[in-house]
Amino acid sequence: MKITSNKQPRTPTLFESLLPILSMVILLGGGYAAFDLPPEPLMVISTVIAGLLVKRLGYSYNEILNSISQKIAKTMPALLILISVGLLIGTWMIGGTIPMMVYYGLKMISPAMLYVTALLVTSLVSVCTGTSWGSAGTIGVAFMGVAIGMDANLAATAGAVVAGAYFGDKCSPLSGDTNLAALAAQVDLYEHMWHLLYTTLPSLILSAIVMTVYGFNSGLASDDVPERIILITEGLNNVYHFNPLMLLPVIIVLYGSITKKPTIPIMLVSAVVAMFNAYFIQGFNLHDIIKSAVDGFNVSMIHQEIPAILHNLLNRGGMNSMMGTLLICFCALSFAGTLALSGALEVIVHQLLKLVHSTGTMILATIACGLTMIGVTCNGQISILIPIEMLRNAYIERGLHPKNLSRTVEDSATIFEPILPWTAAGAYMAGTLGVATLSYLPWAVLCWSGIVFATLWGFTGFGIAKLTKQQQSELLAQAEIDTAKN
């Protein structure tokens, strides 16, 4: 039973509506970006501020809790997918699927094709692992070693690695941010991923053209493979037994993506197959296989000496690896649930949409929101959740499918994040690859061209999914039900 307060709730003013969001921006911009404070308590403080506003508007404490609970309950299936992602990475690692991708990817290196190979192989590894940071910190570091050995352009190599890492991340069902964008927009994961290709695939092609042309005109002629690459490939070959069965877990996920099968069951089947590979082909014991699924793979499970460079490559995955992402999600969803009860987002969006007169300007408004959030908060998850929460109903009212929104937010926040020096992603990529963010920025073509293609498609209508009248009516009706429940 819903408990209400005696005071009749009222609609907030524009200033009251902006106050919680501005508070969150200031707290995250100052605390997280400037002083490196963890974002979770800052989001909790932002939620408290939003809660005080909601109380001032006439809502009760129980109504606030009810709104937060409903917001979390609605996203619980996607949160379960995030946990399944950690399970999949851990089992793919111990089963040999990811190591085999890395092994054969590194075997493809050719001097003149160094830059485009770095782009494409990092993309492949990132698709398979679902982590841009992981692929940049492993394969990316390996390619930087190749570039140093060949006396290549380190900024161009780093740009190729970053672009490839983020393409793979956005087009992988294992990616936390991709799952988060789909759940926030209430769009099927695979539908979101396929729709994202309208902007990421042209950006990848453009990146590949730039890297190929530059590679053939850069004077790279050495055919020597640096010792770093030899250590990785020989180390992996000594630890794992590679055969085509290692690809079966990948094929299962790809099949599920193409046929749009339920995400979690497909991931579980893929993980089970990877476990069988780990036991029957790789020779790991059952205890280590289960531990890898829960806590992630660790090189201590390999009972032989391996090169130190493989430690960073192999130590990853597990369901527990997703707990940090889940905590941020819960904090952000608490803020979103509290704010949704106040009606503040409706007030803000109403003012914002006075400037929107076409699909193109709607896309531009979304890009502006995404860039502002990532530029100020420096947090990818928050920069996904808040703009989608603000604009989803506006898209539906204009007959635009919410997957246009989830795609544009990823283009303007997630993919743009690593080319901003003050964000965690920008700092990580610069520190890991040894190249300043602003130096590799021009070469990370995919990261900044996404918003160009998003804007172009918005004004031309290409790749813009429209809702049928029936779909629009159903989604609007569901939105009214959700509002009534709040």
Task: Locate predicted features.
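Hydrophobic transmembrane alpha-helices of multi-pass solute/ion transporters
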Residues: 2-87, 93-113, 251-331, 486
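Short juxtamembrane and helix-loop transition motifs at transmembrane-helix boundaries
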Residues: 2-10, 76, 93-104, 120-124, ...
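Generic alpha-helical transmembrane segments of integral inner-membrane proteins
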Residues: 22-30, 48, 52, 79, ...
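Alpha-helical transmembrane segments of multi-pass membrane proteins, especially transporters
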Residues: 42-50, 70, 74, 78, ...
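Hydrophobic transmembrane alpha-helices that form the pore/transport pathway of multi-pass ion
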Residues: 110-202, 369-411, 475
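Core mid-bundle transmembrane helix pairs that form the ion/substrate translocation pathway
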Residues: 222-260, 268
